[in-house]
């Protein structure tokens, strides 16, 4: 291949799991001489790593593919490849409707797409990743796939069954990330709760966490914890180890028992409340994030009000809500999508309005406190960062005005919180790293 034909623009859409897949692809390709460009206009090949989880994500993936086709038709690029979740669901349809695309590849076809761009998969590089910015924070994907059967979700169809990554392999990957300057390690999977059961016959999340903590990352954060049978020893470890963030992402989806049964979540409202109480008792400093779904098939106004009351009572520190999306490859697609779209959106907004008030109150209590902040970016003379209670991209930010020239991205500083809004903190830097 010529140098020009080795220039590739990779657009990664969707979740952090997709980001990791893209970073693995980039590391393998770069080892073969492929150069990744900042924009499509500088490349000869475009790769789109798609998301197919909900309708909006599918639409974005299709729109970006159509935009790439326009680039190809204009002669600015020669080849287009589409990979990831969307081809897992609709490969034959995509091949028919988008013949301009030169190849479609699923979530488990890394060697094939490397071949398509003139590279070769090298097993000795399977832990290597080319990190996307910012380089001080990254994700460690501890498993592939999912073996839960939540009715609203098509991930098992897209990603296959749950497969834990060996512990020693994860430690080697974490070391490679650390050597690249990563200081905040975010543990991710479709379900971190089950980690190790398939490989070792028992839950190994706590074992992994202890080993990672010994590696002296500044922050280690837990995301995507399934509530059923969550190992509470993890919370004890969290309270004992200073570099494990007092934070847990625990998607509950709903609280009504009928809906939880229909969702096939394997847990009841009573079980959810007992778990939350146990977590908070073991670690009073923890911040809990959850995700809810509004407008699930058959959800009555009374059942939704039960969800509102649940959120008001539990007072989650962070909460996101999605309007139910009727996905054709999910088990719930067999149910009638009975809640009108307008009502779904209204319920979502109502729950988020409730959470906004809770977030405002909780942030207000931080005013006057001195808190460690991780700096993510600098805009003019303002440094933007997060506390240990805020995950990248989805949670609160902290703006430190006037600190842009005194501190760099990736630094951890001590800041005083001077003001707040529902989803933002405003502070002053008190101490910068030496």
Curated annotation (Swiss-Prot):
Residues 364-431 form the TRAM domain. Binds 2 [4Fe-4S] clusters. One cluster is coordinated with 3 cysteines and an exchangeable S-adenosyl-L-methionine. One of its GO terms (biological process) is tRNA modification. It comes from the Bacteria. Pfam families: Radical_SAM (PF04055), TRAM_2 (PF18693), UPF0004 (PF00919). InterPro entries: Elp3/MiaA/NifB-like_rSAM (IPR006638), Methylthiotransferase (IPR005839), Methylthiotransferase_CS (IPR020612), Methylthiotransferase_N (IPR013848), Methylthiotransferase_N_sf (IPR038135), NA-bd_OB-fold (IPR012340), Ribosomal_uS12_MeSTrfase_RimO (IPR005840), rSAM (IPR007197). Keywords: 4Fe-4S, Cytoplasm, Iron, Iron-sulfur, Metal-binding, S-adenosyl-L-methionine, Transferase. Residues 6-122 form the MTTase N-terminal domain. One of its GO terms (cellular component) is cytosol. Residues 132-361 form the Radical SAM core domain. The keyword Transcription regulation does not apply. The keyword Transferase applies. Its cofactor is [4Fe-4S] cluster. [4Fe-4S] cluster 1 binds at residues 15, 51, 85. [4Fe-4S] cluster 2 binds at residues 146, 150, 153. It is an enzyme of class 2 (transferase). It catalyses: L-aspartate(89)-[ribosomal protein uS12]-hydrogen + (sulfur carrier)-SH + AH2 + 2 S-adenosyl-L-methionine = 3-methylsulfanyl-L-aspartate(89)-[ribosomal protein uS12]-hydrogen + (sulfur carrier)-H + 5'-deoxyadenosine + L-methionine + A + S-adenosyl-L-homocysteine + 2 H(+). One of its GO terms (molecular function) is 4 iron, 4 sulfur cluster binding. CDD domains: Radical_SAM. Its EC number is 2.8.4.4. It is found in: Cytoplasm. Catalyzes the methylthiolation of an aspartic acid residue of ribosomal protein uS12. Belongs to the methylthiotransferase family. RimO subfamily. HAMAP family: MTTase_RimO. This is Ribosomal protein uS12 methylthiotransferase RimO. The gene is rimO.
């Amino acid at each position: 291949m010529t140098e020009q034909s080795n220039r590739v623009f990779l657009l990664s859409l969707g979740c952090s799991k997709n980001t990791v897949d893209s970073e693995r692809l980039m590391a393998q390709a770069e080892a073969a001489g492929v150069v990744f460009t900042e924009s499509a206009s500088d490349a000869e090949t475009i790769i789109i790593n798609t998301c197919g989880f909900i309708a909006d994500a599918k639409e974005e993936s299709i729109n970006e593919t159509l935009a790439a086709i326009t680039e190809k038709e204009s002669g600015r690029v020669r080849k287009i490849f589409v990979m990831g979740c969307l081809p897992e669901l609709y490969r034959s349809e995509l091949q028919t409707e988008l013949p301009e695309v030169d190849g479609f590849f699923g979530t488990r076809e890394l060697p094939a797409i490397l071949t398509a761009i003139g590279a070769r998969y090298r097993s000795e590089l399977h832990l290597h990743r080319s990190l996307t910015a910012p380089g001080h924070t990254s994700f460690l994907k501890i498993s592939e796939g999912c073996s839960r059967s939540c009715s609203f979700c098509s991930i098992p169809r897209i990603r296959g069954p749950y497969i834990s990554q060996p512990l020693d392999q994860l430690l080697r990957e974490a070391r490679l990330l650390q050597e690249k300057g990563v200081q905040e390690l975010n543990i991710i999977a479709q379900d971190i709760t089950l980690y190790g059961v398939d490989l070792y016959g028992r839950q190994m999340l706590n074992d992994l966490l202890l080993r990672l903590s010994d590696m002296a990352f500044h922050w280690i954060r837990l995301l995507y914890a399934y509530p059923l049978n969550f190992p509470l020893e993890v919370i004890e470890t969290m309270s004992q180890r200073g570099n494990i963030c007092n934070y847990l992402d625990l998607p509950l989806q709903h609280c009504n028992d009928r809906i939880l049964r229909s969702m096939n979540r394997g847990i009841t409202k009573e079980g959810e409340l007992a778990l939350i109480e146990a977590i908070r008792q073991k670690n009073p400093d923890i911040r809990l994030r959850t995700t809810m779904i509004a407008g699930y098939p058959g959800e009555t106004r009374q059942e939704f009000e039960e969800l509102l009351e649940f959120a008001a009572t539990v007072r989650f520190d962070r909460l996101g809500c999605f309007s139910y999306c009727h996905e054709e490859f999910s088990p719930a697609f067999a149910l009638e999508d009975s809640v009108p779209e307008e009502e779904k959106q209204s319920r979502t907004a109502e729950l988020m309005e409730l959470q906004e008030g809770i977030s405002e109150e909780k942030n207000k209590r931080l005013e006057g406190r001195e808190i460690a902040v991780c700096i993510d970016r600098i805009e003019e003379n303002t440094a933007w960062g997060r506390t240990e209670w805020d995950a990248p991209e989805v949670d609160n930010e902290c703006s430190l005005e006037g600190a842009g020239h005194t501190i760099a991205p990736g630094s951890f500083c001590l800041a005083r919180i001077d003001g707040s809004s529902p989803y933002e903190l405003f502070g002053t830097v008190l101490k910068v790293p030496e």
